[in-house]
Structure formats: C-alpha cells, structure tokens
C-alpha cells in the first residue's frame, strides 16, 4: 500500500532576505575583554562594543518615543549585551515578577532573540526585568533553561541591564568571520507598550522578521542615537570601525527626498540632521531615515537602519461644545521640539468672527503637551465665534492658530421638535401591552406583549411562558433557570 504524505508549511511572517532594504543590520567587531555583568553599563568596559538603536512599534516602522540603546560585544566563549532604557517622566522602573519564567514581559523588561543558524525556525529567547528576574525559552518552549547571566540596575528615569550568553548554551560554535545570525532586541515599557529593533509584524516571536547580526574581526558598525531625527534636528551618532567603509544616509519627507549625504567614517561618526523648518519649528510631515554602511566588494552591509518619524504641527487646536451643560471646552496640543517646556504657556481667546477678543484664558503646559481652557455660555459670543490659541514662550507669542465655530452653544437645531413624534411609522406597528402586571414576584399575573410580528406571554415570571411568531409557537417548552452553589 502506498502512502502519500502532504506537508503544508505556512510561514508566520514574510521573511527578511539579506537584501531587504528595511531589515536592520549591525556588525559586531573582534572579540575583546569580557565586561563585568553587574547591570552597570561602564563605558570603559564596553569601549570595544558596537551600539544599536532605532526601536519602533510592533507592526510599524514609526520610531518609538522612548529609544533604548543596546551594546553588543563578544569574547571567545560569550555574546554580551548591555541595554539602557530611558523611562518617561523621570519615573523609576516597575517590576513585579520574581519567579523564574514568570510573567516578566509584563514588567519594565528587555527581550533578546537569537537565531544562530538564521534558518527562521530554531531560535532562543532571553528576557529579564528591572529587578533581575529572568525568563528563557527555546522558541516558545519556556521549559528550556539555558546557562546565562543577567543583571539589572534600576535608577530614577532609566534602568540598565547586562547579559552574558555562552555560545555553548546556544548549541553553536563561536561565529566565524562574516557569519550572520538572526537577531532582535525588544523593550517592554510599562504604560507605553513594547518596541522592537527589528520591525516584526504581530509579535516578538517571528524569527523570519529578525534583523541581521554580522560578526567580523576587522569591522564593526552601528548607530547609537537618533536624537537628531526625533528632536527635529541635531545629530545622529554611531560607530564605524575598519577601512574602506562608505556610508550613505537619506532623509525623505512625505516620500520626497529632503536630504542625502555620503561620508567615509573612521571610528565614531556624527551625522548632522536638520529637518525643513516652519519658522522656529520642524516642518510637519512623515520623515523616513535610511542609513547604510558598507564596503566595496562586500555582498552584505555592515549596518543598515530604516525608520520613520512623524512630526506633527507645532500647535493644534480642538474645541468641543457641550450644549446641554452650556460650556465650550478648548484644548491645545503643543509639539515643542527644541523648546524649554517650562517656559511655555497657551493663551486661548474667543471673539466674534472678525472682531476683537471678548474673553481670554491663559494656562501653562502642566503635563508637557496638552493645555485646556473652559468657557461658560455667558462668555461665548452669539453667532459665529473665532476660537484661537497662541503659544507663548516666556510670555512672548511665537505661534497662533484659530478656527471659526457657528453658534457652538446655540445650534439651529436646539429646541426644534421636527421629527419628534410618538407615532410609529409603517410598516412597523406600535408596541401593544395587554393585561395587568402584578407586583414583582407575585403569581397569577398575565401580561401579553406584542411588538412587531410577535406575541410574548408572561405569567408572573422573568421569562416569557410562550412566544408566538406568524401563528406558530417558537418555544419548545417553558424557560427554566437553575443555579447552584457549592454543589447545592
């Protein structure tokens, strides 16, 4: 007897070929001296490492507002990683999981994924939170336990971690020259969600979407900070060690090229970035940064980064009318890149259209981005109203925007009863109720309720005793409710 076996493989995600221009690359240099794994990222101990950053949200290439910095190093027996994670608002990290292989990902934590064979099937996960609790897994099998070290150090406004992962625990030899591993680093930040170095689509467990970690004894390249793009201007910094390295970076705005530069870095490099300006502010738009470092004759890049960043308008205004409550609420959102937020305030004003302001409110940026002001009905001019907000820096105006509202608290429909009727339009029929309902829970009451096309008979209970539709009974029997507690 012959047997035909059909194997159907459905990939979890579209794989990154080595040539994919959106796949991130980083190259770790020659083996060096092992750092002390204590959670303190000492610049001297990590001097020979290669940095990486450019974290984005899951299923998007949009840069995250919080950008961790990762450093990668190695010696003859280990891969080493250091991670520094800034935290919003200067807060301290939050971590509750204390049991090995517990829900570490729910805390402020970092996750490292390694696919030494780069076959998109076998991979390892190493996760740790801000108090040093670990989770390790082979693929999704968390019963696997590896021999590796992890230490964390918490601070106010940030935390850091260091990892030492033996090549032996990855069941592989030390990487050969120009070997390429599947690689990703992810960060979980309480209150902000998760971010990833390599742009996965649905979850961190997508080895086909891991980035590329290249190993070399003579070359190294990576990006350390993208502050120049995120802040609307400044510098992008990184490292490119080795001879013959050529770097190219492009900046696109809404799909059109805004800037392009080429350089031949040697060691640490700095790329000046200046976004197009709208007065004192970076011009609004969706920016795409593409950076690649390569060497002539190589088939693989040394470093590649592709990231998007949306710059919103510097000042946005919204207004909501609460007609019944008789108030108008205004809200301004400030994108104050490059400005001292402590010196900023917003002045709201109402005026008859084309006229002078009749009432103003002024408020400082208390939460860093949003300012609100409320106006009562007596303060709101009749007819068309001009609502404006002016951004102030140390009391001096630097940007004003406005919008016109038409009778926001006395709209034309207020008090109009057009369309309000107790009559039920055809083909629907009015609800008919017959019988007298007794007090709740009493026996013997009988009520018939006839909505459109059905007849519900109630006989003193919560559920109908019968339901009739088109002359036919719908219920096969009475509806009963049974409840039990502790088996009784």
Residue spans for each PLM region:
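Structural preference for beta-rich elements and adjacent junctions enriched in aromatics
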Residues: 15-310, 319
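Beta-strand-rich binding/interaction modules
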Residues: 234-262, 289-291, 332-334, 339-362, ...
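Low-complexity, Pro/Ser/Thr- and charge-rich linker/hinge segments at domain boundaries
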Residues: 220-229, 305-329, 399-435, 439-441
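Beta-strand-rich recognition/accessory modules
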Residues: 159-190, 255, 366, 450-454, ...
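Extended acidic/polar, glycine-enriched regions
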Residues: 266-268, 281-309, 367-415, 420
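Acidic-aromatic substrate-binding/catalytic surfaces of carbohydrate-active enzymes
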Residues: 50-56, 107-110, 410-421, 425, ...
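Bacterial N-terminal signal peptides
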Residues: 2-13
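Solvent-exposed, conformationally flexible loop/turn segments
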Residues: 32, 178, 229-233, 266-270, ...
């Amino acid at each position: 007897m012959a047997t035909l076996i059909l194997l159907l493989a459905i990939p979890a995600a579209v794989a990154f070929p080595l040539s994919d221009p959106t796949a991130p690359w980083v190259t770790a240099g020659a083996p060096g001296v092992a750092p002390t794994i204590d959670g303190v990222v000492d610049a001297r101990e990590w001097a020979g490492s290669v940095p990486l950053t450019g974290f984005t949200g899951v299923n998007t290439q949009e840069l995250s507002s919080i950008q961790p910095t990762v450093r990668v190093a190695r010696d003859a027996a280990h891969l080493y990683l250091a991670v520094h994670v800034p935290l919003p608002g200067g807060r301290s990290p939050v971590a509750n999981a204390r049991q090995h292989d517990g829900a570490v990902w729910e805390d402020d934590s970092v996750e490292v994924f390694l696919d030494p064979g780069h076959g998109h099937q076998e991979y390892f996960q190493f996760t740790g939170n801000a108090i040093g609790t670990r989770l390790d897994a082979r693929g999704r099998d968390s019963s696997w336990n590896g021999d590796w070290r992890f230490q964390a150090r918490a601070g106010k406004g940030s935390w850091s971690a260091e990892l030492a992962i033996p090549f032996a625990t990855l069941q592989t030899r030390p990487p050969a020259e120009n070997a390429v591993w599947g690689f990703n680093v992810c960060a979980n930040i309480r209150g902000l969600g998760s971010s990833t170095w390599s742009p996965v689509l649905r979850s961190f467990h997508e080895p086909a979407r891991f980035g590329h970690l290249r190993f070399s004894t003579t070359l190294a390249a990576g990006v350390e900070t993208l502050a120049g793009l995120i802040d609307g201007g400044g510098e992008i910094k990184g490292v490119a060690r080795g001879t013959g390295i050529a770097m190219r970076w492009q900046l696109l705005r809404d799909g059109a090229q805004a800037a392009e530069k080429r350089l031949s870095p040697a060691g640490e490099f700095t790329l000046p970035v200046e976004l197009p300006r709208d007065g004192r502010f970076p011009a609004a738009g969706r920016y795409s940064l593409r950076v690649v470092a390569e060497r002539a004759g190589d088939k693989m890049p040394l470093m590649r980064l592709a990231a998007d960043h949306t710059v919103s308008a510097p000042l946005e205004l919204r207004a909501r009318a609460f007609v019944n409550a008789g108030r108008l609420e205004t809200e301004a959102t400030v994108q104050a890149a490059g400005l001292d937020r402590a010196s900023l305030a917003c002045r709201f004003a109402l005026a008859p259209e084309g006229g002078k302001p009749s009432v103003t409110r002024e408020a400082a940026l208390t939460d860093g981005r949003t300012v609100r002001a409320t106006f009562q009905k007596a303060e709101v001019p009749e007819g068309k109203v001009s609502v404006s907000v002016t951004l102030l820096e140390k009391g001096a105006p630097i940007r004003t925007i406005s919008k016109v509202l038409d009778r926001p608290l006395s709209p034309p429909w207020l008090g109009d009863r057009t369309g309000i009727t107790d009559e039920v339009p055809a083909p629907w029929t009015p609800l008919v109720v017959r019988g007298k309902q007794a007090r709740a829970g009493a026996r013997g009451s009988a009520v018939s309720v006839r909505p459109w096309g059905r007849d519900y008979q109630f006989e003193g209970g919560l559920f109908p005793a019968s339901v009739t539709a088109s002359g036919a009974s719908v219920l096969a029997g009475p509806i009963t409710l049974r409840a039990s507690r502790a088996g009784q």
